[in-house]
A protein has these predicted regions:
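Aromatic "clamp/platform" in nucleotide-sugar-dependent glycosyltransferases that forms part
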Residues: 276
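Short hydrophobic beta-strand element within catalytic cores of glycosyltransferases
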Residues: 293-296
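Conserved donor-binding/catalytic core segment of Leloir-type glycosyltransferases
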Residues: 4, 189-207, 213-216, 226
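Short alpha-helical donor nucleotide-sugar binding micro-motif in glycosyltransferases
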Residues: 255-256, 263-268
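An aromatic- and histidine-rich active-site surface loop
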Residues: 14, 80-88, 103-120
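Carbohydrate-associated surface elements
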Residues: 160, 179
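Conserved acidic donor-binding segment of nucleotide-sugar-dependent glycosyltransferases
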Residues: 308, 312-319, 328-334
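N-terminal subdomain of nucleotide-sugar transferases
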Residues: 1-53, 363
Length: 368
């Protein structure tokens, strides 16, 4: 099957960075025997330095069509126009190569929907946005409903997101979660002396790293906390760490590639993230694939996969309960079977599992 995976919001091909979730799907489908190409639409503002126009290159063995049309926060209608211009340039580049997909599957945006309609190709869309975690205005809900109804299939990355999409638009989404790299994130243990918690996420308010630091400060004993990620709250969180006199026990490691994160998980005992909102929660899943039990909040995504066998679920913005959960984990870490936790994640989220589900979905769409 010829499949075009597409997504919005990318850095330049010079950095070889595209949306990791969508690229993971493209690679999994390629490995399943399909002819897969990738389309990247970049309509960020001119402030983001990058080449403009349409370029073709290869990333991890996947042919990529990258279209950059600077736009950013412009008046209503102009961003969609920029997206259409970018999509048109991608369509022309694909046609020049003499290749036509059987299915177009886009994440995060609808730029390639017009190409699908023009070429008579089924258009599949995956929703990731936390926009649905609150009630939408009638105008916004109607706008999204019209977009969804033009799709051959609409997917959501979690049950909670699908439920919220139904509440906002009445559209029934099919749940297909993100892929987790179960090769990089596999059970491995590195000996260490002190109990070690690890967390990973953008340093932004919704990840609630400040709440995690407050909860950690209330723990007894001398556990360690390692935080991976970068973002606008970095300075404030480091200042809070100093204020709470935690610098000897907390370390900030910044953004790092997957292999470094996996190595850190091998030397940790528990993953903890006190998010206020998640549509999926790939950070939790990666840690579990590495065999770590997790402490997660009931914030949308984790309810789909956190159980008594692999971790602890707590309410959002409840620092005292978070402290109690961390204390419980320190006392009862050996109750959790790392091999079983990892095996369950592999069964549900491995590349071959998700590729098989998507293949079945595409075949159903093409048979209609």
């Amino acid at each position: 099957m010829k499949i075009l995976i597409a997504a919005s919001g990318f850095d330049s091909p010079r950095k070889h960075e595209v949306n990791i979730f969508a690229l993971d799907q493209a690679k999994a489908l390629r490995d399943a025997g399909h002819d897969v190409r990738f389309a990247a639409v970049d309509t960020r503002s001119i402030r983001h330095s990058r080449p403009w126009g349409c370029y073709r290159y290869t990333l991890d063995g996947i042919p990529v069509y990258y279209a950059s049309v600077p736009c950013g926060a412009l008046p209503l209608g102009l961003p969609e126009l920029a997206g259409r211009v970018a999509a048109s340039s991608i369509r022309r580049a694909i046609a020049k190569d003499g290749w036509k997909p059987d299915v177009i599957h886009q994440h995060f945006g609808f730029e390639l929907a017009a190409m699908a309609e023009r070429e008579g190709i089924p258009f599949v869309f995956t929703e990731h946005s936390s926009l649905h975690n609150r009630a939408l205005s009638p105008e916004k809900a109607e706008h999204l409903k019209r977009k969804y109804e033009c799709c051959a299939a609409v997917l959501a990355v979690s049950q909670a997101l699908a439920k919220n999409m139904r509440a906002n638009t009445g559209v029934e989404a099919i749940v297909v979660p993100n892929i987790v790299d179960t090769v990089q994130f596999a059970p491995k243990r590195i000996a260490h002396e002190r109990f070690t918690f690890v967390s990973a996420g953008n340093l932004i308010p919704v990840k609630n790293m400040a709440g995690l630091l407050h909860a950690f400060a209330a723990l007894h004993g001398e556990p360690r906390l390692i935080i991976f990620g970068d973002g606008p709250e970095s300075g404030a969180l480091r200042a809070l760490c100093a204020e709470l006199v935690l610098y000897s026990r907390v370390s900030f490691r910044g953004h790092c590639p997957r292999n470094e994160l996996a190595e850190a998980y091998a030397g940790a005992d528990c993953f903890v993230l006190a998010s206020r909102s998640e549509t999926f929660g790939v950070a939790y899943i990666e840690a579990m694939a590495a065999g770590l039990p997790v402490i997660a909040t009931r914030c949308g995504g984790p309810e789909d996969f956190v159980t008594e066998e692999n971790g602890i679920l707590i309410p959002v913005d409840d620092e005292s309960t978070l402290t109690s959960a961390m204390e419980r984990m320190m006392l009862r870490r050996e109750d959790y079977d790392s091999a079983a936790i990892s095996a369950d994640i592999r069964r549900k989220f491995a590349p071959e599992t998700i590729a098989a589900r998507l293949t079945e979905l595409y075949e159903g769409v093409l048979s209609c």
